[in-house]
């Protein structure tokens, strides 16, 4: 009886606290809108939103989802940083599900800070002097085509996956928790790796390889590096692949 009463009260509170606009119970038909925004160099991504990057000289942002959810997908630029969030309420009460896709054409993008559960990809190669993907607490997959003089792939918590395809001069990799990073198709001359993850890291290095393996995940490498320096303090291993 107690839990039944709690359930009824919870439903009443949710129903009363959510207006039709802030708490759409139906996503509606898929729709999209173009948004004009100031120039940005970093994207901060939250929630289950898929991000599709389309490198271009002209900046353009298109948001695609159910028409009842569009207004709740915020895209705000502050200090050169674009923050993308799903502010729609009452997700658990919604009668249907709708994917949220954000398509971004931009040239000066240098960093993605990831807190989300959606997937991130690129339709063409991103070209930058320095590019960073920093997964602060994300749980989706990030797969980018990239050419950069230096590239950072960072997973701090949770179970995100990062993969780059392309080449660069230097890569920095930090992988913790249940994350995995695959740079086997991103050829670099120098790679500096720190692994505290239970999952694996893959790299392709032709010059110097520096690896600190502090937990269970292995580091697999190809590319025949000319110099290798490793520190291993747990059961993870540094393994060369043919």
Regions found by a protein language model. Give the residues of each.
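Sec-dependent bacterial lipoprotein signal peptides
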Residues: 1-18
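Hydrophobic alpha-helical segments, principally membrane-spanning helices and signal/leader peptides
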Residues: 2-4, 32-35, 64-65, 101, ...
